[in-house]
Amino acid sequence: MADAAVIEKLEAGFKKLEAATDCKSLLKKYLTKEVFDKLKDKKTSLGATLLDVIQSGVENLDSGVGIYAPDAEAYTLFAPLFDPIIEDYHVGFKQTDKHPNKDFGDVNSFVNVDPEGKFVISTRVRCGRSMQGYPFNPCLTESQYKEMEAKVSSTLSSLEGELKGTYYPLTGMSKEVQQKLIDDHFLFKEGDRFLQAANACRYWPAGRGIYHNDNKTFLVWVNEEDHLRIISMQMGGDLGQVFRRLTSAVNEIEKRIPFSHHDRLGFLTFCPTNLGTTVRASVHIKLPKLAANREKLEEVAGKYNLQVRGTRGEHTEAEGGIYDISNKRRMGLTEFQAVKEMQDGILELIKMEKEM
């Protein structure tokens, strides 16, 4: 049972949401009085409450979603709030649906989406993973952060071949290394206001770090937003090569580290937008004609289940006409299908650009 001080904060937060008439978050849409009353005094076995779930969305009324999962159990205990939000965000993934088992499919069927090198600057595929037996950011202790880092860094240092590389802990990082990682766009910063408000940045930088291979085409972020963000990327449009590298890395890491998986929701992540496959396949792409009107670009992209972001990701502008375009769907389809959807959509956008 949540304690009185927490419930008091929850009541105040709920009032604030109710009063915020211009708030368009999914939290506001689905946290009805009925759902609120049903959940406000519940507590997971690790001590997480509804407050941990909603505080970022209460503090940041301009959130798109507004909720995070403090631990794996939260997805079940607070399901009356999570399930409708998941269904709304992951369009078509109903509350009765079950996410399919992991399936990377035929990794050799992916192609170079821009063999002439005219449109696509770079290609990236990432997935998120959570380590079994550990809560998510808001509930982690400093010693758990360090313990997780030790497990992950020893696993990564055993990788071979193309994946072989170096682990750089954020704790005690020298200015030179820091600058080198910033120049490569590898270094992640302490979380933005959405993550800060969700208590995702405690004990920073303990347990946080970055691994990359010698070619700088494979990267792992440790304890940033998720326990693990596994990233494969390179210049140009060779999606096949990027995806094959990612799948071989995930398969290797999985042999040594058990990941949190939910029968219905797939792989579990801190933010419900990343559940399921957790896969985000993206390109940095220049489409000057299509992008002359961003609204039009977004509309066309939407038809192919693609999401358009600014050059530096969420909440940013396009610099020099370069957009970040990725698959929007992560749930209710396999990893193979998610990446295929992105490949088909990008091929179509390039074809349209050429025809304009």
UniProtKB/Swiss-Prot annotation:
EC number(s) given by UniProt: 2.7.3.3
Pfam families: ATP-gua_Ptrans, ATP-gua_PtransN
Residue sites binding ATP per the record: 122-126, 185, 229, 280-284, 309-314
UniProt KW Nucleotide-binding keyword: yes
Record-level Gene Ontology MF annotations: arginine kinase activity; ATP binding; creatine kinase activity
GO biological process, one term: phosphocreatine biosynthetic process
Reaction catalysed by this enzyme: L-arginine + ATP = N(omega)-phospho-L-arginine + ADP + H(+)
Means of activity regulation: No change in activity after supplementation with 10 mM glucose. However, activity decreases significantly when glucose concentration is higher than 50 mM and almost all activity is lost with 200 mM glucose. Activity is significantly increased after treatment with 10 mM and 50 mM ATP. However, activity drops significantly with 200 mM ATP. Inhibited by 10-200 mM alpha-ketoglutarate. No change in activity after incubation with 10-200 mM L-citrulline, L-ornaline or glycerol.
KW ATP-binding (keyword) present: yes
Highest taxon of source: Eukaryota
Residue ranges of domain Phosphagen kinase C-terminal in the record: 119-356
Family: Belongs to the ATP:guanido phosphotransferase family.
This protein's name: Arginine kinase Lit v 2
Organism annotation: Penaeus vannamei
